Amino acid sequence: MRDAVVEASGGFPVAGHCAIPKPFRQRRKFTPLASERGLPLLAAKARRYGLAALAINNCLHLAALWPEVEALTNQGLGALAMCPSNAYVAPAGGIRKLFGTNPLAFGWPTGDDCPYVFDFATSVIARGKIELYRLDNKPLPDGWGIDRDGQPSNDAAAVLDGGALLPFGGYKGSAIATMSELLAPLHGELIIAIDPTAFGAVDYESHSRALLDAIRDQGARLLSCSIRSARCASTGATCHASSPLAAA
């Protein structure tokens, strides 16, 4: 705010009158404030129509996406959130940065204290991790980035200074990053809320728990398990044994 990058004054005007989508015109404000104001309206619209979307345009300092999708799962709603950002990532097969790290988050209620939630960048690694490698003067693993000439590089400084990160999964990650740029333009965020019961999924909670338990029973690690478990432990909350996030 000191550098006038973020506008501190004014409210969060809502543009449009329909439930899908419902855009917030941010004017360079902090996104968490707008999402806090918009999530109750989004949840109400999703319960009424079965599906609703909140678009926050021209936003800054988004931070993590998981708190927003988790907040919706705590109300019995499924949620999908995405946002583009500044250009840091080259498209698969490309030679220069074009995409943001374009995180994608998803949440689904399971009927207990621990919903299924994930939040990850569509780059092979978060940009902040590259910064840590540079600070520690450590070489990057192969496949994380390219230099300003489009050549593979293990030098964190070369990747950050004129180079680019790479998308995860090659063309698949690149396609998801493209989707995010198309669905959530204007440097904004898109949050979609879903009422599972609106689509005939009356017993969706037990089905969800059974599916996630079947994954864990094979010894596979579910996304965000250890993080959720640590959060539950630190706050004294209980993560049920049937929860997909109860064990690391």
PLM features: what roles do these ranges have?
Residues 1-43:
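Active-site cofactor/substrate anionic-group-binding motifs, chiefly glycine-
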Residues 36, 40, 44-82:
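A glycine-rich phosphate/pyrophosphate-binding beta-strand-loop-alpha-helix module
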Residues 17-20, 48-52, 74-78, 100-103, ...:
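Short coil/turn connectors at secondary-structure junctions
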Residues 135-187:
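Secondary-shell segments that build the walls of catalytic and ion/ligand-binding clefts
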Residues 89-157:
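Phosphate/diphosphate-binding glycine-rich loops and adjacent basic-rich segments that engage nucleotide
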Residues 186-248:
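Catalytic-core signal marking the mid-to-C-terminal active-site face
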